[in-house]
Amino acid sequence: MNIYDQLQAVEDRYEELGELLSDPEVVSDTKRFMELSREEANTRETVIAYREYKQVIQNISDAEEMIKEASGDADLEEMAKEELKKSKAAKEEYEERLKILLLPKDPNDDKNIILEIRGAAGGDEAALFAGDLLAMYQKYAETQGWRFEVMEASYNGVGGIKEVVAMVSGESVYSKLKYESGAHRVQRVPVTESQGRVHTSTATVLVMPEVEEMEYEIDPKDLRVDIYHASGAGGQNVNKVATAVRMVHIPTGIKVEMQEERTQQKNRDKALKIIRARVADHFAQIAQDEQDAERKSTVGTGDRSERIRTYNFPQNRVTDHRIGLTLQKLDTILAGKMDEVIDALVLYDQTQKLEELNK
């Protein structure tokens, strides 16, 4: 099937989806309605671009016809030639864009995410850097109009982050932040360093798509839930009523503890949301690891131990090792202006997939 047949098939399916979503039988089936709505949303941009492309093709045909019929009218002929030139340039641009739009879409791209950041190698300095990364993602989310909610956090004695779990909600969050999973390395002089020596520390980031209950069901028999008293600074119990929740997925051993909320039910709901995402992600990772290497993401969204980026403070430099991108803009990137890095990763991924498709 050539590209035009593919595009026509997408448009036909889009029109079919519009009819299905008006069908009372589909509307009453919440799960199917959501699936079809998501499919329609995922194809909308392609269909709009294809319809605009067909209009450009028509404009080329009209301009060529006008040139033939100009009959010595120099002004009309010049105008038609200008229109033809403009339309041919637009045709090339649309063809490149449509090739990218036809690439297989990640079904998770439109989803919200659960973001986990942990201080790793480097002790207090790693925890402080984890805090810097948290602030960077919070500021970036703000520029995108996303909602950023810290669900659970634990701190060390110097104000650094041992571990933080956050929910980021909004339009196409996963499509932008999915490349952030991996080890982030920092090179800088710690505040406690009297000799001015540069130290290297690491924090790890994990990005998981939010998983709705109807998408992934966990058997209640596979969960062990413990209720205990929430503790404050110094370990003292801060609630007379036990509201904190510890939830364990028995088959995998995945554990979540939640005590941020004032009620047991809210902590239970948040813990279940996180554990559902972690368990789904766990099995997705196993499936991905079993796939052929060529089918894995070319930008490395899979290997959680992969060192993906270095932040060098003395040189104000950020290097993304997966695509060889180096920017002398560390200060602006940590201030949440991440578009240049993220756009480069998206473009690289699309380019690699196009090359793979054309082999």
Curated annotation (Swiss-Prot):
Pfam families: PCRF (PF03462), RF-1 (PF00472). One of its GO terms (molecular function) is translation release factor activity, codon specific. Coiled coil: none annotated. It comes from the Bacteria. It is found in: Cytoplasm. Methylated by PrmC. Methylation increases the termination efficiency of RF1. The keyword Protein biosynthesis applies. The keyword Cell membrane does not apply. One of its GO terms (cellular component) is cytoplasm. The modification N5-methylglutamine is found at residue 236. InterPro entries: PCRF, Pep_chain_release_fac_I, Pep_chain_release_fac_I_sf, Prokaryotic/Mito_RF, RF-1. Keywords: Cytoplasm, Methylation, Protein biosynthesis. Its main location: cytoplasm. SMART domains: PCRF (SM00937). PROSITE patterns: RF_PROK_I. HAMAP family: Rel_fac_1 (MF_00093). Belongs to the prokaryotic/mitochondrial release factor family. Peptide chain release factor 1 directs the termination of translation in response to the peptide chain termination codons UAG and UAA. This is Peptide chain release factor 1.
